[in-house]
């Protein structure tokens, strides 16, 4: 939870973790409201409040020894970026590592230069796609489920991490189920109106879950029946 003094507090995923031991963390913030605008406009030296981290993480340890598929849509690339960096740093602990990342247009791609570097790294299999793009766009055009559907996977040995708009996550998870992955090996990062961060206020309730405590990362075996309930 990030707090802009005198304005308010918002939940925010970590998009970068320092590797030099200084404890620094990074956040990727899109200015869409009063708090995010204040944080977006903050200058070096500005003091901000930080609480957490709260809830569940991607549990990358459970993927050790397995193939790993990371699916990111839009701003969803930011929360999975530390996973990609960690998987590369510990590359020998995993089988294949695959990234499918998409955005509405090339201009909406987060960390695009870094994504291009990942695509050029022989230790990663990367598919980049934009929903719409001009003739100069060298990657795929279309939604993320299209390159995801073309992947050849070993379902019993594959884990998947998905982050992005909820509709994109549902369709991506369904694509992976059709390819034979088990729901418990597919994890999503869910969003609701998180406020307290410790499971007290109930604003982030999704059925029996309080996402600040039981999420935001949830197995699809748990999430699927909840996401099928209208207006939940």
What does each model-identified segment do?
Residues 1-46, 103-105:
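Ferredoxin-reductase
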Residues 2-4, 50, 206:
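A generic structural signal for residues embedded in beta-strands
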Residues 3-5, 18, 90, 117, ...:
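Sterically constrained small-residue positions within well-ordered secondary structures
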Residues 9, 20-22, 63, 196, ...:
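A generic fold-level signal
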Residues 27-29, 126, 188, 204:
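Preference for bulky hydrophobic residues occupying beta-strand positions
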Residues 34-195:
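FNR/FR-type flavoprotein reductase catalytic core
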Residues 167, 190-216:
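Local cysteine-cluster metal-coordination motifs and their immediate loop/turn environment
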Residues 207-232:
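Non-heme iron-sulfur electron-transfer modules
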């Amino acid at each position: 939870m990030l707090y802009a003094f005198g304005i308010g507090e918002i939940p925010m995923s970590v998009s970068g973790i320092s590797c030099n031991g200084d404890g620094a963390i990074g956040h990727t913030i899109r200015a869409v409201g009063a708090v995010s605008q204040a944080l977006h406009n903050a200058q070096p030296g500005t003091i901000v409040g930080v609480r957490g981290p709260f809830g569940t993480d991607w549990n990358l340890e459970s993927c050790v020894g397995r193939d790993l598929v990371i699916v990111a849509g839009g701003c969803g690339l930011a929360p999975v970026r530390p996973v990609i960096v960690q998987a590369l740093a510990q590359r020998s602990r995993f089988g294949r590592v695959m990234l499918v990342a998409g955005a509405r247009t090339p201009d909406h791609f987060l960390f695009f230069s870094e994504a291009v570097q990942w695509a050029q790294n022989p230790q990663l299999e990367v598919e980049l796609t934009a929903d719409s793009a001009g003739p100069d766009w060298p990657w795929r055009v279309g939604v993320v489920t299209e390159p995801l559907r073309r992947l050849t996977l070993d379902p019993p040995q594959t884990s998947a991490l998905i982050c992005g708009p909820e509709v994109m996550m549902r369709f991506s998870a369904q694509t992976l189920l059709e390819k034979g992955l088990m729901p418990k090996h597919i994890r999503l990062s869910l969003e609701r109106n998180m406020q307290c961060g410790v499971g007290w206020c109930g604003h982030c309730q999704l059925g029996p879950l309080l996402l600040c405590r039981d999420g935001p990362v949830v197995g699809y075996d748990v999430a699927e029946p909840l996401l099928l309930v209208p207006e939940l």
